[in-house]
Each structure stands twice: as C-alpha cells, then as structure tokens.
Amino acid sequence: MHDCFSIAEIIDLEDLGFINPGHAASWAEEGRTDSNGDLPTNPSGGLISKGHPVGATGVGQIFELCKQLRGTHPNQVRGAKIGLAHNLGGCGVTCSVSILANPNA
C-alpha cells in the first residue's frame, strides 16, 4: 500500500475494498494487518519505515512483492502466493494497482 502518511494505509485498505469502511484502524490495532495477520499489509513497514523514493516507489513495491512471492523477504508472509502493489503519484492524480502471483508457491 502507498502509505506515505500514517492514515494512508487505513484509507487504502478501505477504499480498495479489503476492509469495510470504518474498520481498518481496528484491524491494524488488533494486529490483523501484521505479516502474520489475516491481511498482511506492508510487511517491510511501508514507506514511512523504508523511505519514500518519489519516482521509484512503485519499483520498490514490486521488488518487495517479488521477494515475498519467492519466499526470500526478511519479514516473510507465510504461504505468500499473490500480492498487490498500490501506488499513488502526482498529488493523487495517478493511481496504479499491480497484482503479482507465483503459481508455483
């Protein structure tokens, strides 16, 4: 998720339809979005943790997904078979969503 601000992950999870509106904050507080939770989200810690290289954020997200799907990520999500990268740019005027899968996982 493109979480350049703390609230962004919560908004994104709800806007993308993963969690019902008004419930994403409680999911995060309960650990349900942790790497071992019901809906692992940003196991690297997201943009706030690893940095926000404007213009290269999407490449970083895809790299992280590839490592997850290959089973080589330091914060590996157990049984990762599919991943979603969500990125924003240009003050919210550009949005991309990429879905990657490892059929051999």
Task: Please provide the spans of the model-predicted regions.
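Claisen-condensing/thiolase-fold acyl-transfer catalytic domains that form or cleave C-C bonds
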Residues: 1-105
